[in-house]
Each structure stands twice: as structure tokens, then as C-alpha cells.
Amino acid sequence: MRQVAAGVWVATAEIWTSNTVVVVDDDGAALVVDPGITPTEVDGLAAAVAARGWRVAAGLATHPHWDHVLWSAALGDVPRFATPTAIAALAGDVERGWQEASSAAPGHDRALFGALTPLGSAPVGADVPLVPPAPRGCRVVVHEAHAPGHLALVTRGVLVAGDMLSDQEVPLLDVGPGGDRARAPLDPLGGYRRALAALEDAVARYDVAVLVPGHGAVAVGRDAVAARFTADRAYLHALEQAAAQPPSGHAGCDVPRTVPDERLADRWVAGEHAAQLDFLRARLTGR
Ligand SMILES: [Zn+2]
């Protein structure tokens, strides 16, 4: 684990540069956010927390994708908070999530997978405080980008963004569980933009200077944090423009059909990009 701010530590898993965040209060009470990914890594995290004399007081799952709802008995039997919307979404799709977890990171305890406690009322776009047993000074911003009931944690000058604002992944829209378009939100692009606005408001309101994405490098400094927002908005704009063009296009058209973004050099990210471009085109043409 490495410290990124006073009381905020980050552990990075070998799979997909996945980041787990540990927030520690003065009395050693710790909040563990999105522990992952393999059982060995999660157990190692528990051992590292114990070795520092901290005690896990609560967990937090940013959103209902399988790699964000893992746990280990070694972390203790504590409430693991998530939004009611996220918990409902996971409940409706838990077997698929468990199969994905078992395939990519075998050996987790099925009984602990996604065993989450609903947060109290948290309107979309608002930021609300986490209550004990979570450490003091933790707030969550609830939004509708990427997955149902996604939240970000803001604490101690750090934004823990979940699966947004990554230097490795372009914005990944909520295109329905497992790509089931019938269950996708009506306006995933608009929801994503509103989420970016809500998070940027929180960055300004709470003087955030460090951003930890769910996957990828930590952004340190206000300029680096702002650059993540700029890059994600530019991608969404280019994606929307490209979706408005027919796939083969017309000669002489000055609206770009391609999306320039260095994150698309990754083969998996490029595949996700192609899928959401096709999703948006289908929505526009009523397919
Ligand atoms: Zn996700």
C-alpha cells in the first residue's frame, strides 16, 4: 500500500491495475473501498491493514460490477456499503457477476460476494456524508454513469472515482447488464455527462487534489485531476459525433468518424469503445 494523502492509502492489484483504497481515521478505524482482485491480494490487504494496527470498520463498493464487490473473511464481518440502486442491480444479475469473478479470480467466498448494506437515501447528483462505522469526513456522490447506483467517495482531498476518470479506460457507458441493451438506461451519454459535472462540483467544493480511478494511475495535483475531466469530456464528444455518422460515411463530410484517444490503443478498451459506438448508433437509428 502507498499513501496518497493523509489517511488515504492505495493498493493496486495485478489485474487491470485495479485500485483498492483504504481510508484510516486517527483511531485506526479503516474504510476499505473496492477490495480486489484475487483472493490472495484481498487477504494480503487484510494482513497489511492488521500489520499497521488498523481495524477494518466498514467497506464501500463504488458500483455493482463483480470486481468491485469482492471481500474476504480476513477483512472482518463489517457493513459493506453501496447504494440501494447498486444493490438492486447486482441482485438482478448476481449469477453472471459471480461467474465472471470465478473465471477471472477463482477462489473467492460465494457467501461474501456482493453481500452489501444499503446506504441511506442519497439522491442522484447530491453528496451525502457516510455515517459511522465509516471514518469521519467521508462523503459520497451518487450518479448514473457507467453502472446503476455508482458512487464516488470524497475524503481528505481525494476523489475515489470508481470506474471513471481513468488514464487507461475511456468512459464506459452503462449499456445494460452484460450488454443487454433492453435494460440499458434511456440516456447513458447524458447520465455520464451529468455525473462528470457532479464530480467536478465535488472536486471544487472539497478542494480535491488527488484522484484515484478504479483502474489506472492515480492523478496527483489539481491540473492532473482537471485533465482527467477534460479527456473524458473530449472522448464523449467525439463518441457522440462518430455515432451520428453512418459507419461507412460520406466523402467530404467534415465531422470526424474516428475517435482520437490514446486510451483506445489497448485492445480491450478498443473493443468496449466499438460496442458502445454501435449501441449509440442503434439508439439513433431505432435498431
Ligand atoms: Zn465497472
Question: Model-flagged regions — what are they?
Answer:
Residues M1-A51, A152-D167:
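Conserved beta-strand hairpin/beta-sheet module of binuclear metal-dependent hydrolase folds
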Residues A13-W16, A134, H143-A147:
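A short catalytic or substrate-binding loop motif that flags glycine-/basic-rich loops and adjacent residues
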Residues L31, I37-P39, D43, A51, A88-E144, P148-A234:
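Metallo-beta-lactamase
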Residues P39-T85:
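Active-site metal-binding motif and surrounding structural segment of the metallo-beta-lactamase
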Residues A46, W71-A74, D93-E95, R156, ...:
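Short amphipathic alpha-helical segments
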Residues D67, A88, V218-G221:
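Short, active-site-adjacent cap segments at secondary-structure transitions
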Residues D201-V210, A217-R287:
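Accessory terminal helices/loops
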